[in-house]
């Protein structure tokens, strides 16, 4: 018998962590000698640390190669404790068999493994704090990265909790059980949470964890949160008077209003001004046929400066306002108020001395004067009051200056 026996090293996995290594005898294999040969005598193994080319002696690592006796024959094992292995290190295991007459295998059995006890890590950065349905579905903000320096990422898991009732998302509903859902992909992972499963004005907490190929599971989770907001803001136009002239019109603040938002807060306010006589819209410098939304000064309390020279006598104007919040919701039922610009004085009517309809030419009273008037009119804003004066000459005011009736 001059033919050597043969052996095979069988290491099931490429990567092991401490728990995985301890679960089973992980260095094992088979050996045999051909039929009609002397038969297998024993099997030895050599274990090399590939990071520094040292060999296991049975108790320590040495620069000299040591062949160590395995347990068994046709099926053999070798016990190497996890405490002898170093995180992040690859090991090469070789086997050689010897037969009954001393022939030694020269084409060694060979397999490798890498020991990995370092947890993977993940990142999660939800770009915004507030989302509405369109913003959430288009941004797909549940995504991030995962990394592992040794064995690589096997899977990424997502945990989603609803703050309003502490329930967890299970992929199609909300339940009391904490359920980690599988993310799509690994190194660049994502998770689809449809907006239809989100409730208005509710905060959601997201946690991410990864598992590497060696079975290490991340324990310091990446986390972030967001608030779902689909309620539009509210705004009002507050125009103090129904009618203005060039004296009481304030170009700085006659057009003003307020706005509010209960969840994400206000982002901006826009107003549009319609000239009702011809359906033209104010564009900021001139009137155009297309509606224009322009920004006033301020947000929660706002004003818009408009010179009275841009207003036309006898014409009414309608001012609309709409708010947009940080989540992107735009007010649909807009604020609205109107005013009319009136520069035309009332039309004078008839004034009669005395209390009768016929003008009185004389009076015998030395203590009282009386008068009546009629047919005064105003086509735009209407008449709200009268003043009278008394003079010793027509149109004079020397006896009594203008006094409100």
Residue ranges with predicted function:
Residues 30-35, 145-149, 258-262, 372-380:
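Acidic, Ser/Thr
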Residues 55-75, 167-190, 280-301, 387-405:
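Recognizes extended acidic, P/S/T-rich segments that occur
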Residues 1-9, 14, 99, 109-125, ...:
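Flexible, low-complexity linkers/stalks enriched in Thr/Pro that connect modular domains
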Residues 43-45, 156-158, 269-271, 386-388:
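Short beta-strand elements bearing conserved aromatic residues within extracellular beta-rich modules
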Residues 14-23, 129-138, 243-251, 358-366:
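Short, solvent-exposed loop/linker segments at the N-terminal edge
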Residues 25-28, 139-143, 253-256, 368-374:
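A short beta-strand segment in extracellular, disulfide-stabilized domains
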Residues 82-89, 195-202, 308-315:
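Surface-exposed, short loops/turns at beta-strand junctions within beta-sandwich domains
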């Amino acid at each position: 018998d001059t033919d050597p026996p043969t052996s095979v090293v069988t290491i099931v996995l490429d990567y092991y962590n401490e728990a995985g290594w301890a679960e089973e005898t992980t260095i094992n294999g088979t050996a045999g000698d051909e039929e009609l040969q002397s038969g297998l005598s024993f099997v030895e193994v050599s274990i090399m640390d590939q990071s520094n080319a040292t060999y296991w002696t049975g108790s320590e690592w040495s620069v000299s190669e040591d062949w160590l006796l395995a347990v068994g024959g046709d099926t053999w094992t070798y016990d190497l404790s996890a405490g002898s292995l170093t995180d992040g290190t690859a090991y090469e295991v070789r086997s050689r068999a010897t037969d009954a007459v001393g022939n030694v295998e020269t084409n060694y059995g060979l397999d490798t493994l890498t020991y990995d006890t370092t947890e993977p890590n993940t990142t999660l950065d939800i770009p915004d704090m507030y989302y509405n349905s369109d913003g959430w579905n288009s941004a797909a903000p549940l995504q991030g990265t995962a990394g592992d320096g040794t064995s690589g990422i096997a899977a990424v898991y997502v945990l989603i909790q609803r703050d309003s009732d502490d329930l967890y998302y299970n992929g199609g509903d909300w339940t009391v059980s904490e359920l980690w859902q599988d993310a799509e992909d690994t190194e660049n992972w994502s998770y689809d949470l449809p907006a239809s499963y989100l409730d208005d004005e509710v905060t959601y907490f997201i946690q991410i964890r990864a598992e590497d190929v060696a079975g290490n599971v991340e324990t310091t989770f990446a986390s972030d949160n967001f608030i779902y907001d689909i309620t539009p803001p509210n705004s009002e136009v507050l125009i103090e008077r129904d009618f203005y002239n060039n004296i009481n019109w304030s170009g700085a603040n006659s057009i003003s209003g307020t706005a509010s938002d209960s969840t994400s807060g206000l982002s901006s306010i826009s107003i549009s001004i319609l000239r009702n006589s011809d359906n033209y819209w104010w564009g900021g410098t001139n009137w155009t046929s297309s509606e224009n939304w322009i920004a006033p000064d301020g947000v929660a309390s706002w004003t818009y400066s408009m010179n009275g020279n841009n207003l036309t006598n006898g014409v009414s104007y309608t001012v609309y306002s709409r708010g947009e919040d940080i989540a992107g919701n735009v007010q649909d039922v807009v604020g609205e108020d109107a005013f009319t610009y009136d520069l035309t004085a009332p039309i004078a009517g008839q004034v009669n001395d005395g209390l009768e309809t016929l003008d009185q030419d004389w009076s015998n009273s030395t203590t009282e004067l009386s008068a009546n008037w009629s047919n005064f009119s105003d086509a735009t804003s209407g008449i709200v009051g009268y003043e009278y004066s008394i003079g010793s000459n027509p149109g004079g005011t020397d006896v009594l200056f203008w006094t409100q009736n």
